[in-house]
Each structure stands twice: as structure tokens, then as C-alpha cells.
Amino acid sequence: MEERQTCDLAGIWRFEIDKEDRGFAEHWEKRRLTQTITLPGCLQAQGYGDAISEDTPWVQSLYDALWYQRGEYAYAQENGTKVPFLSQPPRHYTGKAWYQKTIFVPEKSDGFVGRLTLENTKWKTTLWIDGECKGLSLIHISEP
């Protein structure tokens, strides 16, 4: 029976938000990203993205467009916008982001098959290894 090894990738990753969608054209897969983020975790909870305001798209679509003027939300005026949801994200961002992690595979890895599992990504994921595209996944399971 073949021995199965796992590598926990939780921890600090290099990271950058690609708000202007320049990453592919500028080959960000070949450069060292400049910011850091802890995974697992979401970027909004770690201070990335835009501040929540009345202009945030999903806030604008609330049924009661003037909800922030109602008395029960007066507490929010001092500390910034609060929305009438049980769980409010501290920041808002739904665009592209790049994540980068260095791992080492032992040289004695003939027949190595790697499997990368990512949770809670949106839309699609592209996997790069050593600057080379290894796959695009819409179901978020990729085996290079």
C-alpha cells in the first residue's frame, strides 16, 4: 500500500489584491507578492478591502434604503457604518486576489502526485507552480 503524505499549508502566505485585474498581464505568478495574509481565513477579516459604507453595493440593495437613519442603528454613527445583519464583514472586496506559498517537495518524489484543496474560493482558481500554469479549476480541486 502506498504511503500518503500530507502537507498542512495553514499559516502566513504572501498575498496581493488585484483590484485593477493586472496580475495576469503583468505576470504576478513570476514575482514575489508583497503583502501577507493568514490562511485559513478571509481577506476582509484581516483588514483587506474597502470600508463598509452606505455606498457598498450590497448595502445599497437593502429593502429599507434609509435603514442607517433609523433609531436602532444610531449607535453605529460614531464608529462607522453598521448594517442590519447578524454577521457583518469588517471590509468589502469581491475581486481577484493572488496568494503565494513556497513549499519544498523532496527530490525522492518519483511518481509524486500533488493535490491542492482550497476552501471557500470564489468563481475560479488558477494554480501556478514555479511560474508555470498547472491548471484552472471551477470546482476548486486541482491535481498538477
Where do the PLM segments sit?
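Short, Gly/Pro- and small/polar-rich lid/capping loops
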Residues: 1
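Short Gly/aromatic-enriched secondary-structure transition segments
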Residues: 24-40
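Accessory beta-strand-rich segments of carbohydrate-active enzymes
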Residues: 5-23, 41-142
